Amino acid sequence: MTSPQHSNHHRMIMRQVYYFIVLIALAISSCQRTNIPIATATAIPPTVTPRATTESQPIPGGPYLLRAGISIRSVANADSGSIKLALDPQTGDLYILNSTTGLRRMKMDGSYKVEKVANPKDILEDGTLSGMAFGPDGALYVVADRKVKEIYNQAIIRKGIVDLQGIFQWKTLAETEPYPLSNTPFDHMFNGIIVSLDGKKVYVNSGSRTDHGEEENNHQNFKGVRDVALTAKIFQIPTDAENLTMPNDEDALKAQGLIFAWGTRNAYDMAFAPNGDLLAGDNGPDADFPDELNWLREGKHYGFPWKFGDQDNPQQFPDYTSVGDKRLSSDFTAVQIGAYRRDPDFPKSPGGFTLPVANLGPDAVKYRAEDGSEHDAAKEKLPLYTFTPHRSPLGLAFSTSPKMPADFRGDENTFGAFILSWGAAGGNLSDRGQDLLYLKLTKQGDNYETTATQIAREFKNPIDSVLVENRLYVLDFGTGIIWELTFE
């Protein structure tokens, strides 16, 4: 599911993916409490599975495959802690980003040879690399975060252009003003990035600095501060910018046209559907509320911190108390630090939220009811908006190649896609993630609904994927292995 290399960084990137996320959303403007999935007019079609269910573990200790006609092999080791994959559209090579070791390239000529491209300091003298994406022209955009005076974060987006010697030359596309850190694992910072299909702008995720909109004052350095203008948003930046400064001021950001969408908690990974729609996985809070898949559109608000899926954040209500809240577990960090509490100053909801994609199952649809019981929304013929809590969705990749088998492709009415789950770091819901889902997305009104079918499981915190024709490359954060799954 949504922050590397300062003192807390290694733990934070794991939490970042776990806690995420990009895009909490709902179309309900009232503050009526909603603690279980809402029955709607959404049609629940028959369960859709791509092919016959099997279970095999072709490589001892490796992932289990759950559908016939899929093979798997390890093609490279990218080192533990690698966080991003990106395909160079000019050369076809696969690039690997690691916050510690920098940028490497895996040759896609069948050799899968991995070679160093740049050290972190070649890209940015001072900072932690956290995301990357190629433009259609081969320009590479890298996101980084750096700590300023120990209590602020500054995000930087660097642009690399290959020179005649084949070496990336780097310049700063944009950087933020320093903004307050919370000094908690919920400092998600800037990370996910994607380039528009025409190459004219980049979309960049800035995760929240809170778990669920609570005050995080960083040892009284920022009394009363929750999320700020530079957090919990998707930004859009022209690719022809240079040294653009992004102020920590909402009105100024709006005046510059830099805000694309609001209310995303940590949209760590974004991808374009075949029709050009931009979708992203978003990580829910450190409580048993859903993670999300959102269709990102300019000007929309996706609910954070007032909504998680289609459910209300209870802390916004004056009578809330964490005592007896069955959606909290003692092993959640937010619980351990007392982030769930009575909060009479919680900001009033602006309403007008956009719902996440509805998940019809059969998989990744577990939810926690208000009484603490675990339920399966698909078995109850209810949509879940979108995934089981704590799955931390990321590595979204759409299936478009004619070389992909028909049952793993979309048709005139649907889009096929794959999405990974980093996996639960706490709680006791039976769905623990660390798997690969096949999604079949269908446009319904002004949003999408999807089926979700588990096709592989027991990765080791998978963090990103790239689809090349009928081969899906999956990066395991825990092992550094790059797995190649081939669909026949």
Predicted regions and their residues:
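Acidic, Gly/Ser/Thr-rich repeat motifs that build Ca2+-stabilized beta-propeller blades
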Residues: 48-214, 278, 389-444, 471-486
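Sec-dependent signal peptide recognition
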Residues: 15-23
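Short beta-strand-to-coil "C-cap" segments at the C-terminal boundary of structured domains/repeats
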Residues: 160-162, 237-239, 296-298, 484-488
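Ser/Thr-rich, Proline-interspersed low-complexity disordered segments
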Residues: 26, 31-59
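N-terminal secretory signal peptides that target proteins for export/translocation
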Residues: 1-14
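Beta-propeller domain segments
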Residues: 48-65, 208-258, 264-266, 270-451
